[in-house]
């Protein structure tokens, strides 16, 4: 792909596998020439002259390849699935709005990379650039949009970082341990489960009534991670999930180089839960796969090394139970004092 200055940028996609001549496309949002070669496996090899254009192009092309998948995740992230599937999506929508990130967005984005905010904003701009194209020319929309009589919504950085909802499940373990503590002592639990490193304090807060733990406390939390119940999709039996990975030292390999084995247990789906891409720009030269709706490469390699992504049984979440004021349900007890809850009104459209 190539870009030229003067308001619009020329994105020249060279599809060697599909045609004998290069295709050129003008895009607003990039500042220098970007080249893209799509290989025989459908993988985009993107080469840009700066970081912004690189991730803009990644977002644009990923949305072009996976637009309906993007729309489903946007609805999951924003709590708008009930407008698509009716009451079956209501609990998921309530959970998504309950768990929405509401703190310092800039700090959160830059936590992932020193330039995280700029990278994610460039990626989102690329996604939205393609969505705007489909609004001008609905013929570009995948058939699912016509079938469901919907159009894709625009993305925000908040939608991108909400993907963490798909890779966390520690709160369920927290609740299971708490329930077990109501019947056996902490030492017995430590003999059944492996805690590393250190010795965790498994004692329940004395103010917690064990009977509270019997309730379905995580109903909304779990609903956020469930698939959107589209009747048009084949309902396959759920298989147990898990992941594993290991590294073999170069001292034990014939080549003398280490070997990384990364095995995230993701179900086979269509479209795939992975998206392959090659990203090249000053300071960047990586190839591999990752979540389709997230910029960068989470499982891949560069000239210097390889990396992977799996979900460990890590202590990544904390579960708190608060006592409510019996005389005012909008107050909770904190440090022996009643505190007012921040009330946020949400409206959920149901089909």
Features from the language model and the residues they span:
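A conserved hydrophobic secondary-structure block that centers on an alpha-helix together
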Residues: 237-239, 267, 272-288
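Short Pro/Gly-enriched beta-strand edge/turn motifs at strand-loop
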Residues: 227-233, 274-283, 326-333
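Bacterial N-terminal signal peptides
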Residues: 7-16
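Short secondary-structure boundary/capping segments
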Residues: 148, 155-169, 274-279, 313-316, ...
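Compact, glycine/acidic-enriched structural inserts
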Residues: 286, 291-351
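Substrate-recognition/specificity elements adjacent to catalytic centers across diverse enzyme folds
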Residues: 23-259, 264, 270, 296
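N-terminal secretory signal peptides that target proteins for export/translocation
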Residues: 1-3
């Amino acid at each position: 792909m190539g870009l030229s200055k003067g308001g619009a940028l020329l994105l020249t996609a060279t599809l060697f596998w599909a045609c004998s001549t290069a295709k050129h496309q003008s895009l607003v949002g990039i500042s220098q020439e970007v080249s893209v070669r799509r290989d025989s496996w459908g993988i985009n090899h993107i080469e840009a002259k700066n970081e912004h254009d690189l991730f803009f192009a990644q977002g644009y092309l990923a949305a072009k390849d996976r637009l309906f998948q993007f729309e489903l995740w946007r609805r999951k992230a924003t709590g708008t699935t009930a407008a698509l599937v009716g009451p079956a999506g209501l609990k998921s929508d309530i959970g998504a709005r309950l768990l929405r990130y509401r703190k310092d967005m800039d700090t959160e984005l830059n936590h992932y990379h020193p330039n995280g905010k700029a990278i994610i904003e460039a990626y989102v701009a690329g996604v939205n650039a393609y969505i705007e194209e489909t609004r001008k020319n609905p013929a570009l929309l995948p058939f699912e949009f016509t079938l469901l009589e919907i159009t894709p919504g625009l993305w925000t950085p908040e939608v991108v970082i909400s993907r963490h909802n798909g890779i966390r499940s520690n709160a369920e373990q927290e609740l299971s341990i708490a329930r077990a503590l109501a019947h056996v002592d902490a030492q017995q639990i430590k003999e059944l489960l492996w805690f590393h490193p250190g010795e965790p304090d498994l004692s329940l807060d004395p103010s917690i009534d064990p009977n509270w733990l019997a309730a379905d406390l995580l109903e909304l939390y779990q609903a956020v991670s469930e698939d959107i119940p589209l009747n048009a999709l084949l309902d396959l039996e759920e298989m147990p999930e898990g992941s594993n990975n290991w590294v073999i030292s170069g001292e034990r390999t014939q080549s003398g180089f280490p070997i990384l084995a990364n095995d995230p247990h993701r179900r086979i789906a269509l479209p795939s839960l992975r998206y392959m891409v090659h990203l090249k720009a000053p300071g960047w030269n990586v190839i591999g796969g990752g979540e389709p709706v997230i910029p960068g490469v989470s499982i891949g390699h560069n000239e210097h090394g390889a990396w992977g992504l799996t979900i460990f049984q890590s202590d990544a979440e904390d579960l708190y139970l608060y006592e409510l004021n019996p005389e005012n349900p909008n107050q909770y007890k904190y440090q022996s004092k009643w505190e007012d809850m921040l009330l946020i009104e949400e409206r959920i459209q149901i089909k």
